[in-house]
Amino acid sequence: MSVLFVISGVTGMTGNELVHQILSKDDDARIIGFDNFYASSIETVEEYLDDNRFDFFEYDLNNEKEMDAIKSLVLDMKDDFDEIVYINCAAVVHTEHFYNVYETYQTNVVGMNDFLNQAIDVGAQKYINCSTSEVYSMNSWNEHGGVKESDYITMANAEHSQRTSYATGKLLTEFFMKDAVNKGKIKGCSIRFANVYSKDEKYPKHIIPHIINSFKNDGEVTLLENSKKNRRTFLQCL
C-alpha cells in the first residue's frame, strides 16, 4: 500500500527519525515535510534531499499561506496514494520559555489544531499527534513508576509554572484529537513522548542540550522551578 506522509517539524528530533525510518523501509512511501528550523537544521535530513520520495519545504506551521501551499500540494498528489497520514511533530518546547506562558501557545495549540483540520479537509485517513509526558506533571516518574495512561490526570495538584501551561496546551491538543476521532472525522491518536534526546540536537532548546550548553558557556546550570526535587528519565534516539 502506498502512503503519503505529511510531517510538520520534519527536521526536528522526532521528525527526522521518521524520515529515516520511513524511507529506509518503504520504497512506495512519499513524504511532504516542512520545518522552520526552530530547534534543528537541514543537516538532519540532508541525505534524503535528492530523494524523489521526499519533498522538503522551509515553512512555518503558523504561516497561513505556506500551509495553504502544503494543502494544495497534498490535494494534487492524493489520488496517487492509497492512504494519507499526517504527523504533527512541530512544537515549541518550554525550556527557554519557562516563565513566558504565551510563547508555546500559537504553535503547540493553535498550529496543531489547524494542521488537524487541514488533514480532515484533504481527506487524510490518519493523524498522529505528538504530545508530551509533561501532561503527567511532577508524577511523570517516581520509585513506583509514576502515572499510567489509564490514570486520571488531576490538574488541581499541577505545578504552577511554564511547564504547567506547556503541559496544559499539549493536553488540550489530545482532546482536539480525541474529539475528531470520536466524531468519525479521521482516525488518529496522541503519543505522549518521554524526555527524548538525540545526537542530532545542536541547539539548547531541549533540557539536555540546555544543560550541556550552560556548563560549556557559564560553568553552571540554573535549576528552574521544581527542578531540584523532580526526577526525569530520558530516551535517546541513536
Describe each PLM feature range.
Residues L61-T107:
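NAD(P)H-binding glycine-rich loop region in Rossmannoid oxidoreductase-like domains
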Residues W141-G146, L171, F175-L238:
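NAD(P)-dependent short-chain dehydrogenase/reductase
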Residues D27-S40:
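Conserved glycine-rich Rossmann-like NAD(P)H-binding loop of the short-chain dehydrogenase/reductase
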Residues L49-K65:
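Rossmann-fold cofactor-recognition segment
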Residues N88, D114-S165:
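Conserved Rossmann-fold NAD(P)-dependent oxidoreductase catalytic core, especially the SDR/UDP-sugar
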Residues F5-L23:
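N-terminal Rossmann NAD(P)H-binding glycine-rich loop of SDR-like oxidoreductase domains
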Residues V92-H94, S133-S140, A194-Y197:
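Active-site segment of SDR-like NAD(P)-dependent oxidoreductases
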Residues N62, Y99, E103-D114, H160, ...:
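Glycine-rich NAD(P)-binding loop of the Rossmann-fold in SDR/ketoreductase-type enzymes
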